[in-house]
Amino acid sequence: KTCEDFMFSLAYYQYIHNFMAINTPVYYYRQNLNSATGKRALQHGLDYQIVFTNISNVFNLQNFPKETTNIFQRRWTRWIIDLISNYKSQNLKSKDIEAAVYSQPYYTAMMHFIPQGILHRIELWLLKKKYSRGIALYCNIMMHFKHLLKRYKL
């Protein structure tokens, strides 16, 4: 089996009992259009709630350093922001976006996400104020800005 999407694949995470983080790249990750990460649909967001809870429990049981937990929280936050920024291609309505963004545990993760830089502070402020349309507009602007700069991440 391919491990291309190992870190983000539901197939692996559904049965997780243990988790280990290392500070060395094991493989080169690329986004597979047929993978769970390639299909940014609302249903994946709802499915990931189970995954998030399981991994959070593993972090708590194994007493992982705060830095490791923060890395996980940041990755999760970026995924939700990407989900919102791609809402047009998924035909998601504003209420569907709001339901995904403000459902637990995503909202809690984002509220505890440590702001780093102006972009993260803007995102955090929009989330605290619960401006769903503002978040969607902001993400669309950033998505086009990223495209112009040919950058992958915000």
Question: Each PLM stretch: what is its role?
Answer:
Residues 59-62, 83-91:
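Secondary-structure edge/capping motif, primarily at the C-terminal ends of alpha-helices
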Residues 50-71, 108:
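C-terminal, non-catalytic tails of nucleotide-sugar-dependent glycosyltransferases
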Residues 89-154:
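Membrane-interface aromatic/basic loop that binds lipid-linked glycans or pyrophosphate carriers
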Residues 66-74, 97-100:
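Short, charged, amphipathic alpha-helical segments
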